[in-house]
Amino acid sequence: GWQGQRLEPDFAALRTAGYQAWWEHMPLPKAMRPVAGRARIHQRLDWGRLARIQLLDARQYRDPQACPKPGRGGSNTVRRHDCPALADPARSMLGAEQERWLAEGWALDRTWNLLAQTTLMARCSLTDTAQGGTYWNDGWDGYAANRQRLLAGVAERRVPGAVVLSGDVHANYVADLKVDFDDPRAPVVASEFCGTSISSQGAPQAR
């Protein structure tokens, strides 16, 4: 599958080779063939008049993860109070062009609008949110403003049957998605279903 952490984004030649290997060994349509070291992953599919399925690319166009720890780049957990960049509105997980593409793609005449993407979209803190919370900077919590823009667009357009399909976090989640996760009275604008891994271990479940 498409997992950005399997590639090394700092080295263009390795990334190009990774895209080519992915293309050669996965059952993909011709339209997704890599060109000039780039691979167009995001696309939309219509299932008659019942559903529109939009597939996102949350790896190629993103800003770097916020607040990297010394000696360790990439994915980390960071405290919200210690990392103002988590809420920086200029940062994007999708990139400006893909954000616009998605905003224009909701099908108001379909019963269902399914958004398939790679990781948990719901807010998920490892510590008490009343104390600010601790978040994984590689997922949507690391790009909170982009998530808010996406969900605000769903709310403003009253997108029917909005469902987000996710994975990556090695656990099953079912979540209500809101524009403002800090407001317990905020309306639900979409539902999320996150599938678990087949064999990889997830986070501890003890309470």
Positions of predicted regions on the chain:
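Long, structured stretches of catalytic cores involved in phosphate-ester chemistry, encompassing
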Residues: G1-R207
